[in-house]
Amino acid sequence: MKKCDWGAGQYLHQLLSENSLKRMVGETALVPMLVDGDKLIAFCTFAPLDDIQPTDMSPWIGFVYTFPDYREHRYVGMLLDYAESIATVMDREYIYISIGHTGLYEKYGYEFYKMDKDIEGEKSRIYRKALAVEGPDKDRRYESGTKWKAEIVKAARENVDMTAYCGFSCNHCFLGEWCGG
């Protein structure tokens, strides 16, 4: 990520290095990454917030990037599908993306929703995708999201003393009600 030729990717690296990403976009933020061996192919964020704040819209996909050598293989679609699957398991009706340009997300089913100002005061285009209420798309996303959820919970519980969070309400845990604890 540090070697990314995109300023926002370098900014994400900085936020992660300083442990400040979750303060900015929410404690449940995830950073899905696609790798080829030890090489990073693509990444994004999936979080309760993005650069449009404050807002009731959630969840958000942000910092979407594919390294030049891996472009034209629709890896962005894989990242979007991951986030959409998790959002489906969370029973969200929509998923959002804030972006300054047009042309990429429309081909993945995102539609322009509205203009709003970002945290820097700049105008930004907000796109959203309706997550199917019923049908095969929702079923596929739900099945995929359930698998991802299990992996997230497993990773979060690894080397964690269960008493660290099982004695508290789900509101105090970054997993929320996902873990079933």
Residue spans for each PLM region:
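A short, well-structured alpha-helix characteristic of acyl/acetyltransferase catalytic modules
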Residues: 1-6, 137
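Active-site rim helix/loop that mediates acceptor-substrate recognition in acyltransferases
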Residues: 5-35
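Short hydrophobic/aromatic beta-strand or adjacent loop that forms the aromatic wall/cage
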Residues: 29, 122-127
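Conserved beta-strand in the GNAT
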Residues: 31-33, 39-49, 60, 65
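Active-site beta-strand termini and strand-to-loop segments that position acidic
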Residues: 35-37, 129-130
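Conserved acetyl-CoA pyrophosphate-binding loop and the N-cap/start of the following alpha-helix
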Residues: 70, 74-82
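Conserved active-site alpha-helix within GNAT-family acetyltransferase domains
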Residues: 89, 93, 99-123
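Cysteine-centered metal-binding/redox modules
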Residues: 141-181
